[in-house]
């Protein structure tokens, strides 16, 4: 099926995040609602999104209910449908790529909705099969970009954390965790009490239910407390007398390989992110990674993006 000739580079991260969140799961074959015209289908979708009506969205898009339910625990998957509706209310165009297919163009940035409309007989419906792969590819790209951005911010977050001793200690050290243990300030994020200073990760996670969340934009994160021979300065431990003083590093791994991400990422205090495809068992492989060690099997993440110069339809 011919797609409209519209290049949408990864740089348009914010706009893409806003518009992709109403479609966050793999599509499944289920009974779908059809419509007399593409315009009728488009407005039904917008109305369902505006009402945050999961049943209506499932009927229109053909998702099964089990896939829709996954939206609650991950802020990257959570449905911020009000923003989607706002963008569609500003700009909604229907571009017919053939007599039997059409695409929705949404928002001021002319975002091409990933699920096309197709005509069967005299009725139109969203082609969820055609949209599934495109949606997955876009979601993976966005999740990976967001993960790289978080890791690039890690040096600033850790320096902010290290400015003062924490939890009654007289030692200034880096955080050993991303999320603090309940009742402690041993991580980059904690629930700030009334009048208490916000945690370094507070601004980034202000709209996230950190008690329910198990990942962030499809990735899990873990601090690394040592580095290997391939790291600048060679192998050594960052821990001194139980405190993370000699440096810091982190590892990020996709929750579901091939669905929420493909590449795994590492970073240290210099903020340069490296990537590697750990394969379908990324989560198991990652469990044995104890040190920051960007050897020749890892590549610079941003360099790969520049080289590939990816575009989205």
PLM region spans:
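N-terminal secretory signal peptides that target proteins for export/translocation
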Residues: 1-9
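Short, low-complexity N-terminal intrinsically disordered segments enriched in polar/charged residues
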Residues: 27-47, 131-156, 160
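Short beta-strand edge/turn micro-motifs at domain boundaries
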Residues: 102-105, 109-145, 152, 272-276
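Flexible, glycine-rich surface segments
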Residues: 161-261
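Bacterial N-terminal signal peptides
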Residues: 11-25
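Short, well-ordered alpha-helical segments enriched in acidic and aromatic residues
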Residues: 53-65, 171-173, 178
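C-terminal soluble interaction/assembly domains
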Residues: 246-300, 311-312
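Surface-exposed, charged secondary-structure patches
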Residues: 65-113, 210-217, 222, 227-230, ...
């Amino acid at each position: 099926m011919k797609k409209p000739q519209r290049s949408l580079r990864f740089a348009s991260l914010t706009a893409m995040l806003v518009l992709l969140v109403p479609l966050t799961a793999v599509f499944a074959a289920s009974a779908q609602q059809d419509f007399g015209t593409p315009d009728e289908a488009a407005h039904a979708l917008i109305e369902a999104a505006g009402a945050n009506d999961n049943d209506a969205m499932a009927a229109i898009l053909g998702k099964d209910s089990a896939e829709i339910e996954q939206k609650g625990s991950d802020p990257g998957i959570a449905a911020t449908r009000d923003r989607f509706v706002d963008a569609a209310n500003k700009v909604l165009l229907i571009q017919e790529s053939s007599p039997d297919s059409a695409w929705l163009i949404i928002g001021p940035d002319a975002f091409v909705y990933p699920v096309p409309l197709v005509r069967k007989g005299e009725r139109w419906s969203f082609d969820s099969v055609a949209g599934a792969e495109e949606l997955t590819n876009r979601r993976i790209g966005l999740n990976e970009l967001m993960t790289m951005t978080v890791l690039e911010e890690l040096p600033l977050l850790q320096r902010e954390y290290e400015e003062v001793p924490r939890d009654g200690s007289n030692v200034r050290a880096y955080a050993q965790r991303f999320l603090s243990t309940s009742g402690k300030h041993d991580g980059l994020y904690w629930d700030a009490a009334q009048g208490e200073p916000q945690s370094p990760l507070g601004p980034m996670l202000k709209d996230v239910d950190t008690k329910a969340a198990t990942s962030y934009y499809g990735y899990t994160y873990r601090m690394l407390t040592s580095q290997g021979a391939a790291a600048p300065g060679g192998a050594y431990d960052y821990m001194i007398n139980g405190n993370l003083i000699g440096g810091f590093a982190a590892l990020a791994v996709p929750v579901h390989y091939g669905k929420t991400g493909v590449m795994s990422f590492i970073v240290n205090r210099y903020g340069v992110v490296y990537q590697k495809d750990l394969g379908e068992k990324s989560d198991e492989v990652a469990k044995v990674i104890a040190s920051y060690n960007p050897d020749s099997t890892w590549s610079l993440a941003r360099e790969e993006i520049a080289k590939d110069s990816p575009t989205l339809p």
